[in-house]
Structures are given as structure tokens and as C-alpha cells.
UniProtKB/Swiss-Prot annotation:
CDD domains: AAA, HLD_clamp_RFC. The gene is cutlet. This is Chromosome transmission fidelity protein 18 homolog. One of its GO terms (biological process) is DNA replication. SMART domains: AAA. It comes from Drosophila melanogaster.
């Protein structure tokens, strides 16, 4: 209960004003500050104490109050009592406890204490009158107040006030003047509130003063509504009017005003201008004149510069193409998508560490160091973060945060190069891909070296140009800038050049060794390479697409392109309008080069470019190859109707009419046929439609369209089979009508979700793999096991059951410890596997464990994904694999025995006659005596003239005959000094002879 005031504090708060009035009395009337030295002062003290005692009698105090522990702590000293109290000895010689009522220490100012009981006589008087104060409290209080008022007036009248000296001077004070006494009585909190109110009041006055310059939105809307109500009418009014007609054939009557009304409005505007001028001060006219001169000088300078530029260009370079003339020179001049520009520039800046020696910090590293929003660890993993710049908490999205799909890998290798060392720009022609590569490369500080891959298609020339552009000897040019290689039309390069580029990027190219014995070093790529192509899905670009940073070039916005064309037309003084340029951009497919060339053609003919010319002429149109996604988009989406300008070619004089585009079924069918025919790859288009048609929004809730679409898929498959297998190209034109049927079944106004078809390729790879496995299985079947079937019978009837047949239940023990039943099952499994040519091979699984699988893999032929079936443990497979190898060796060994003598003799003679080549040995040729002593033989020869002569050969001695027989032997032996490690077999001389 210490926080609540007691009776004494309530008294002080109730009569605070009167007590402060007593404090302001002169010194001769203040008898409470200390003991008096004169009797007159003592008498005055008694007289002044009486009204105070009367005031204190009016409080409602009881006996409990006087005997409370708070009052028992009050002590009185000589300094606090008057002279009579000291004489009577009513004081106990102490001081008032100032902590009890919060009285500050130090000499008393005014009243000696904040308590109402600072004099002992007052307490005694209250004790004597406590019984009567309850019944006569109101009369006592009124009497005490009257006495206090008389004393106060008597004391105040003795002082001369300002009003007595100067009269009424309240009008001299400013509105901000405040009585010092009142100002002193306020607390600090009240002063703060008053300062806030003062600031708000000044702001309100400032807003009211600025209302003459600007009204709020509600006031302006109200004023506009009142103006229309006074000056516009849908009915015939009473005031003068002018009738006009809207586009919906409704008439509106506009009011005519007199000249006096116009003059009054002008005067009102000028009066408002004077208010504005008063804010600017006396120098308003001078400031306004200087501002006008600055604006006029800038406009004149710009017009003069444009006229000078146009005239100089027209005179100096009359035959220069506008495409080269207005080619972007700086980054801000690019018309392409900003995200595309920033992505390519970010990839180029990742080469700064290798090329320029500057440290490059990726976005992830910066967020890890500084953190998003100023936090030390980054706020990517937090739900909320505090942003020091704004001083607010910001939501990071948490688990709902959309993760951006970045095709760029921001990681770097050991040398500080990006992981994707080549950028691949792809998009339709004419959008500015080459211009973008040149501009961003120069902006990043490189010297652009362009190589057109379709100029010289030989791999040697491509290799030489690529090496010269990236070698350190020719890296720096006159401007001391490193080279950036730009390979334009990379899709026109041969496959060998693309393969060499991939090896060059992967640091797999080695330099030629000049010195003998030197070690070849691989070439390290230290310069960025930018490749440009039209079709990123070209088969030749498949190896490059896997290692490159692919940047898809989106089409340029038609409105943004038209704004740039307006500037060019203004500089070249070509008369045209914004609508005509937008129509030209849309008709050309937002092709920048085509639009600028068309404008230059009309300017050369001294003819203005109008909307009629754009619609009637074949401007900006060219035979472009439609991409696969563009064709699929045309199949699954209905084009929204747009406003067009319809003209009749036969009636040129009649004005054109604005109509909506035709969205009838006939027009849609014609558009689909044109788009599909421009692509030509019907098989790939069919696969894309087949894999994406179920992902689209079905306009048919009964799914009858799905059944109809499947019939068209069967029809298309049949036609393609006739073309590919039987070479029947007479049915080729019917392939495109299936896309028309699918368009009419599944096309909607919504944007389709299309994914590139990959299931056909995956199924083809799986089919090829399974076909190879089955062929290996058929080759391994021995002749004794041909009864199990061949072809489809083996695949359907035998293979599904082999997994269960080849899975015996064996214990994990040695072969000698197996039971007879287990040994019989093991022997049967081994015989079946040897007859079918199967075995277990140890391979490494995707998890990193080694397992035994059948070779050929029967699981790929018979097991479904996710169904393991019956399987053997690792130990059993290892045991069976070992026994199968031993059985194959045992069967391959020749069978031996001890046959009988006649049979052995016959067998030996037969074996000698049919001995295999690898077992036969060379035997010496016998020289018989008959040959040595044979009779001479006649030999027929021809002489020089061609006549036939007979020559007799006589026999020589036995030694000569023996030597001649040896010389005529087909095998010679010659000793050669040295040895050869390739000969590993010991050969004796008798084996050769």
C-alpha cells in the first residue's frame, strides 16, 4: 500500500494552491521559517497560525491517524518550533523525517516541510477539536477559507503590481507569451506534450498554406466531377452548347462560355500564380526567366545536334546501312531482356581473377559474409530478417520462398575459372545476339575477336583461329585489353570442330613438344569464349551443350522496339507514327534488323511509312525455321483475338476499317498447318505432343477427346511405319493433319506447360540394352540345352523361371559341410548355369557395395522395377560362381583312358592322320639312296631364239645330293647373335628339323 497516498499527502494535494500562495507572502508575514526575535513577530505568528489550524481542522483524521506509525516517526527540533513551543518544552528535540513524504534535504524554501504537521500546536488543536470537526466540518472549512482569503488579499494589496503601474498590457504580449509562474509550475512531460502539439499545429498550417498549390486526389476528383456536371450533358440543356458524337453513337452536349467567364477564370489563375510567386519571394520573375532560358537552350542544343548529325551522316555517308549506324555502343543501348544481359555479364565477370587478376566474390560468398539485410550469417535460412537500411523486419519467405532456377553454376575451379567455361547464346536470327556479345564483352573490358565458324569449315582452320585467339603471345592488343573469343554460327561448324572445342575447353589439348625429351604440357584456357547459334538442339551441339552456360535469347518487346524505331525515324527525318512502327515490329517478329532495313528502304524512296504500307507490303517477313517449342505452343494454345486494320486491295480509295483478328476454326487450322509444315520434323513433334497432351487443361470433362487423340496417334504411327519401312512417301502429306486434330481437341487460351520429350529416347536405350542382353544369352546356350526353346519361347517361357531355378537354399558353410540335399541342389544349379552359359560376376552397385549379378543380366529381362523377388545371399552367389568356373574347366579338359592295343593302334594311326595343327611337329625329310644314285633325267629348255632343247642332268656324288636335298628343304636355320625377349618358349633344333 506504499504506492497510495495517505491522509497527510491527500491534504497537501487538496490545498496545494493555498499553501503556495502563503509561500509568496513577504518576509515580515512569513513566521514559519525560523524563530522570531521580537514579540510582535511572535504575536503575528499566532495570528497567522490560526487560519492554518482552521484549515487543518477540516481534514477527516481520527485517532488511528494520530497514533499511526508514520506520525510516530515525526520528531521536532528547536529550529522548527516557535519561541513559545520551546518555552513550554513540547518539542522532543528532533527533526522531521523528510523521507516519509519525499521532502528534499537542504534549507527550507517557503514552507519548511511538505507535511501539513510541521507545528506541534496545530496537532494539539486538531486533537482537541477532532470530535467537533465531523459535525461542523463544512462550516469550519468555509470559515477557514474566508479567513485565508482575507489574509491573502490583505498581504497582496501591500504589493504594487504591473497592472497598478502600467494598466492593461495584455495586448502587448505575443500569443506565444506565457506567464512565468504558470510555465514554472508545469512538469517536463507537459512541456514535451506542448512542444509536440506546437509542431503539429505548424505542420497543419503549412499544409493549409500549400493547398492553393496542390489539392488532394479527392478534391481534384470532386472538382472534375463538378466541372463535368456544369459543362457536359446527355440531354439538350438550357445553356449554349455544341453537340458531339461518341464512338458508340451517343451524343454529348458541351457548354459554350462567354468571354467574361474566360476572363474571370484567367484572373483566378493569375491570382493563384501570385500565391505561388509569394512563396518564391521577390526574385520570382528573375528565377522564372532564368529557368525558361535554360530549358530553351537545352532544347535548341538538342535539335541542333540532331539536325547536324542527320545532315552530316546524310552528306558524309549516304550509302551506310542504318543497321550498322545505330548499332548499340554501350550497355544501356541494348534492347534485349535485362535478365539475359545481366546473366551474360555476370558470367564474364567471373573470369576477372584469371584475366585481370582481380578477386571475384560470388553472390553466395557475399551473402555469407555480409548477410542479406545486414545480418552476419545471412538471412537465407531465417524466416524474418532485420534490414538496417530501412529499419524494418522483412520476410524472407521461409519455406514458401521460391527458389530461383539458375542455369549458371557460380562455383569456380582451382584456377579461379567458372565451371562453365563457354557461354552458348541461342535464339532466332535478327534479335541481336552478336551485338549483345560484342557490347557486353567491351563493357567488361575485353577486346572482341570474332570468328565465324561457318566461313571456313575445315577443322584445321578452326583449330588455328581458336589457338591464336587465346594464346598468351597475342592476348594483348593496342588498347592493352585481353581477347574475348566470339564464335558466331557455331551450329554451322562440322562435328570435328565441335569436338576439338570441347577438348580445348576441358584442358585436354596438349602442346607440341619442340625439344627432344621434353614433356608435353596441356593447354589451359584462360580467356572466355562466347558461342552463338540459332538452334541449341542441333545434333552437332550436343557435346557442347552439356558443358556450356546456355543463355536463351527471348524475343524483344514490341513496344520497346517501337520506341527505339521512333528515335531513329526522328534522327533520319522519316515521317511515320508510333502505331505504324508497332505494327512493323509485330509483323517482322520483333526482328530489329528487318525493321531498320524496312525504314531505310522507305526513306530512300522519299516516302513516309504509314500503317497502310505496313499492312499492304511484305515488310519484315522472311522464311524462318520455327523451333520445336514454338510449334508445340501453336498446337496447344489458341491465339487471342487482336485489333487489326482491314483493307480491301481492290478498293484502294476506301478507308481502312479496324476489325478483330479471325479466330474461326478455318483460320486456326490454316495457322497450325503452316507452322507444322515450316518445322518438318514430324516424328519429334509427335513425341512432344504425346508426352505433353495429358499435362494440358482438358476442355472435355468426359475424356472422349483423349480416346480420339489416341486414334490419331495410331494413325500417325501407321503412316510413319509405311514411310520408314516400305518407303511409301505418297502418304507423307497426311502426317500433318494429326496435329490439326490434336489442336482442335486440346488447344485453350491458357499458356501451355511444355517439356522437351525424353521418354522416347530413354525407351529406345532400354530396348537396345535388353536386346543385346538377350542376344548374349542365346549365344551362350550349349547344344545340349537347345530344348529349352529359342527366340520368343526362350524369353517368355524360360527366362522368367530361371531366377527361381537358380536360387537354391544353401547354408553359409563350406561345400564339404553341406547336406546331401543341398549338394544335389548346388550340383543341379551349376549344371544349368553351365549349359545356358550363365555365371555370377562381381560388380559395384550405385551405393558403392560389391554384389554378384548374373552375366548376362537376367534381372533386366524378367524382373519388374521395384520387385526384388527371390534372391541369393552374397556368400551363396560367390560359392556358385566358383563352382561354375571349375565345372567349365573340367568340361573343357580332354577325356583320357587306357584303350586296348588294336584299338590304340588304329586310334593312333587315325589320330596321326587327323592330328590338330597345334599338336603337329616338324619331322626331318629322309634322303634315300635311290635318289642319290638315280639315272639322269631329260630337261626341256628354250634357247635365246625360243627353240626347245633337251638337257640331261647327271647324278652327282652322295655328298652333293645330300647337300642339294638339304638346300631344297623349306626350313632353314641360321644362328644370329643376341636374343629377343619376345620368344618365351624353349625350342630345340631337332624340333625345327
Amino acid at each position: 500500500m506504499d504506492q497510495y497516498p495517505d491522509e497527510n499527502e491527500e491534504f497537501e494535494l487538496q490545498y496545494q494552491d493555498e499553501l503556495e500562495l502563503l509561500e509568496d507572502l513577504p518576509d515580515e508575514f512569513n513566521a514559519y521559517d525560523g524563530p522570531s526575535t521580537s514579540k510582535q513577530a511572535a504575536e503575528k505568528q499566532k495570528e497567522n497560525r490560526a487560519p492554518v489550524a482552521a484549515l487543518r481542522d477540516s481534514t477527516r483524521l481520527g485517532n488511528s491517524t494520530l497514533g499511526s506509525p508514520q506520525l510516530s516517526q515525526i520528531t521536532f527540533g528547536a529550529s522548527q518550533l516557535g519561541g513559545e513551543e520551546e518555552a513550554e518544552g513540547t518539542s522532543s528535540g528532533g527533526q522531521v523525517n523528510r523521507r516519509l513524504f519525499g521532502t528534499p534535504k537542504g534549507p527550507p524554501v517557503g514552507r519548511g516541510c511538505s507535511t501539513p504537521f510541521q507545528r506541534m500546536p496545530a496537532i494539539q488543536e486538531l486533537e482537541n477539536t477532532q470530535l467537533t470537526s465531523r459535525s461542523y466540518g463544512l462550516e469550519k472549512e468555509n470559515a477557514a477559507a474566508n479567513q485565508l482569503q482575507e489574509v491573502g488579499l490583505k498581504n497582496v494589496n501591500k504589493r504594487r503590481l504591473e497592472r497598478d503601474l502600467f494598466g492593461d498590457i495584455d495586448d502587448l504580449f505575443h500569443e506565444s507569451y506565457e506567464d512565468p509562474m504558470v510555465k514554472k509550475a508545469r512538469t517536463e512531460e507537459q512541456r514535451d506534450h506542448e512542444a509536440i502539439e506546437r509542431i503539429l499545429e505548424l505542420r497543419r498550417k503549412m499544409r493549409e498554406s500549400s493547398k492553393t498549390l496542390r489539392k488532394d486526389d479527392v478534391s481534384r476528383l470532386k472538382a472534375l466531377h463538378d466541372f463535368k456536371m456544369r459543362n457536359l450533358s446527355y440531354e439538350i440543356p438550357n445553356w449554349p452548347f455544341l453537340a458531339i458524337q461518341r464512338s458508340d453513337l451517343e451524343r454529348i452536349y458541351v457548354r459554350f462560355h462567354s468571354e467574361d467567364y474566360e476572363q474571370r477564370q484567367l484572373d483566378l489563375i493569375s491570382a493563384r500564380g501570385e500565391v505561388v510567386g509569394s512563396l518564391l519571394g521577390e526574385a520570382k520573375d528573375k528565377i522564372w526567366q532564368e529557368a525558361g532560358e535554360i530549358v530553351l537552350s537545352r532544347a535548341t542544343a538538342a535539335e541542333d545536334a540532331d539536325v547536324t548529325l542527320v545532315n552530316s551522316n546524310a552528306n558524309s555517308e549516304p550509302g551506310r546501312l542504318w543497321v550498322d549506324k545505330y548499332k548499340p555502343r554501350k550497355y544501356i543501348d541494348l534492347l534485349s531482356d535485362e535478365m539475359t544481359n545481366r546473366s551474360l555479364l555476370y558470367w564474364l565477370k567471373m573470369w576477372d581473377k584469371v584475366v585481370f587478376g582481380k578477386a571475384f566474390h560470388s553472390k553466395r560468398e557475399q551473402e555469407a559474409v555480409t548477410g542479406e539485410g545486414g545480418t552476419a550469417g545471412g538471412a537465407a535460412n531465417q524466416l524474418n530478417s532485420f534490414n538496417k537500411r530501412t529499419g524494418k523486419f522483412e520476410s524472407n519467405g521461409g519455406w514458401r520462398q521460391r527458389k530461383s532456377r539458375q542455369a549458371l553454376n557460380t562455383n569456380v575451379d582451382a584456377l579461379g575459372r567458372p565451371m562453365q567455361k563457354v557461354a552458348l547464346l541461342c535464339g532466332p536470327p535478327g534479335l541481336g545476339k552478336t551485338t549483345l556479345a560484342h557490347t557486353i564483352a567491351r563493357h567488361a573490358g575485353y577486346n572482341v575477336r570474332e570468328i565465324n565458324a561457318s566461313d571456313d569449315r575445315s577443322p584445321e582452320a578452326f583449330k588455328l583461329a581458336l589457338e591464336n585467339g587465346t594464346q598468351m603471345s597475342s592476348v594483348l592488343n593496342e588498347d592493352k585489353r585481353p581477347n574475348c573469343i566470339v564464335l558466331d554460327e557455331i551450329d554451322g561448324a562440322p562435328r570435328q570442330s565441335i569436338d576439338y572445342l570441347v577438348k580445348f575447353i576441358s584442358d585436354a589439348v596438349y602442346t607440341k613438344v619442340k625439344a627432344k625429351g621434353a614433356k608435353a604440357e596441356h593447354n589451359v584456357l584462360k580467356r572466355p569464349i562466347i558461342c552463338i547459334c540459332n538452334d541449341v538442339y542441333d545434333p552437332a551441339l550436343r557435346p557442347l551443350r552439356q558443358v556450356a552456360f546456355v543463355v536463351t535469347f527471348p524475343p524483344i518487346d514490341a513496344a520497346r522496339l517501337a520506341e527505339r524505331l521512333v528515335k531513329i525515324a526522328f534522327k533520319e527525318q522519316l515521317k511515320t507514327d508510333f502505331g505504324s512502327l508497332i505494327a512493323l515490329a509485330e509483323k517482322s517478329g520483333n526482328d530489329v534488323r528487318s525493321c531498320i532495313s524496312s525504314m531505310q528502304f522507305f526513306n530512300a524512296q522519299k516516302h513516309s511509312l504509314t500503317l497502310q504500307d505496313v499492312l499492304n507490303n511484305n515488310l519484315g517477313q522472311k522464311d524462318r525455321h520455327q523451333g520445336l517449342f514454338a510449334v508445340w505452343d501453336a498446337i496447344f494454345r489458341i491465339q487471342r483475338p487482336r485489333k487489326t486494320l482491314h483493307t480491301d486491295a481492290n478498293k484502294v480509295d476506301e478507308p481502312a476499317q479496324v476489325t478483330m483478328t479471325n479466330t474461326s476454326v478455318t483460320t486456326r487450322v490454316r495457322n497450325v498447318l503452316e507452322v507444322v509444315h515450316s518445322s518438318g520434323d514430324y516424328e519429334r513433334l509427335t513425341q512432344g505432343v504425346y508426352e505433353n497432351y495429358l499435362q494440358q487443361k482438358m476442355p472435355d470433362p468426359n475424356f472422349t477427346g483423349v480416346c480420339e487423340a489416341l486414334k490419331w496417334f495410331c494413325f500417325t504411327d501407321t503412316v510413319q511405319h509405311q514411310i520408314s519401312r516400305q518407303q511409301n512417301y505418297s502418304v507423307y502429306p497426311y502426317l500433318q493433319y494429326g496435329f490439326v486434330a490434336w489442336h482442335l481437341l486440346f488447344a485453350t487460351l491458357a499458356w501451355p506447360k511444355i517439356a522437351f520429350p525424353t521418354r522416347g529416347f530413354e525407351f529406345q536405350q532400354k530396348s537396345t540394352n535388353q536386346r543385346n542382353i538377350f542376344q548374349a544369352l542365346c549365344k551362350g546356350v550349349t547344344t545340349s540345352a537347345l530344348g529349352v526353346g529359342q527366340g520368343g519361347t526362350l524369353l517368355l517361357d524360360t527366362v522368367p523361371l530361371l531366377k527361381r531355378i537358380l536360387s537354391p537354399q544353401l547354408r553359409s558353410v563350406a561345400v564339404q559341410l553341406l547336406s546331401p540335399k543341398e549338394q544335389q541342389d548346388l550340383r543341379h544349379t551349376i549344371e544349368v548355369m553351365v549349359d545356358l552359359g550363365l555365371t555370377f560376376v562381381q560388380v559395384k552397385s550405385q551405393e558403392g557395395h560389391y554384389v554378384f549379378q548374373t552375366e548376362p543380366d537376367l534381372d533386366a529381362l524378367s524382373a519388374f522395377p521395384g520387385y526384388t523377388g527371390l534372391s541369393l545371399p552374397y556368400f551363396s552367389r560367390q560359392l556358385i560362381a566358383r563352382e561354375v568356373d571349375l565345372e567349365r574347366i573340367r568340361r573343357a579338359a580332354p577325356k583320357g583312358g587306357a584303350p586296348s592295343a588294336p584299338a590304340a593302334k588304329k586310334k593312333t594311326s587315325g589320330a596321326a592322320a587327323q592330328l590338330p595343327n597345334h599338336l603337329q611337329t616338324l619331322k626331318p625329310k629322309p634322303i634315300s639312296a635311290s635318289n642319290m644314285h638315280s639315272a639322269p633325267k631329260q630337261q626341256l629348255t628354250k634357247d635365246f631364239f625360243g627353240r626347245i632343247t633337251h638337257k640331261s642332268t647327271s647324278t652327282n656324288s652322295a655328298e652333293e645330293s645330300k647337300t642339294d636335298a638339304i638346300v631344297k628343304s623349306p626350313i632353314w636355320y641360321r644362328y644370329k647373335e643376341g636374343f629377343n625377349n619376345a620368344v618365351r618358349k624353349d625350342v630345340h633344333i631337332h624340333e625345327l628339323l
